Amino acid sequence: MFNLGNLGEMMKMMKSMQENIEKAKEELRKEEIVVEVGGGMVKVILNGLGEIKDVLIDKTLLTEDNHEILQDLLVAAFNEANRRTKEVMGEKMTQAAGLPSNIPGLGNLF
């Protein structure tokens, strides 16, 4: 039969988990991730939620001759920033939800 006492405990656990996740989001918002490509010629700075804060480009890339190189470096930087953000966010949210971190692919859910 259905036990209402267990339901109450589950609701408390869910509320606690939700509070932990909100706290983790605030921590991620404050966290800074720096991605450098091209030997530091392009740098992307973002927070743990993936919000881009700054893009720094070496002035030597800002010429017509370097147009394609700059495009390639920007693509590489944004792809790496995306990968790193997912990694950091997955770890933080898995921890906040109280889930084991050794389950493959679990971090990709967040």
From Swiss-Prot:
Keyword Cytoplasm: yes
Keywords: Cytoplasm, DNA-binding
Subcellular location(s) of the protein: Cytoplasm, Nucleoid
GO molecular function, one term: DNA binding
Pfam families: YbaB_DNA_bd (PF02575)
One cellular-component annotation, GO: cytosol
Subunit description: Homodimer.
Family as reported in the entry's similarity comment: Belongs to the YbaB/EbfC family.
Record-linked HAMAP family: DNA_YbaB_EbfC
Function recorded in the entry: Binds to DNA and alters its conformation. May be involved in regulation of gene expression, nucleoid organization and DNA protection.
Protein name: Nucleoid-associated protein PERMA_0533
Organism: Persephonella marina (strain DSM 14350 / EX-H1)
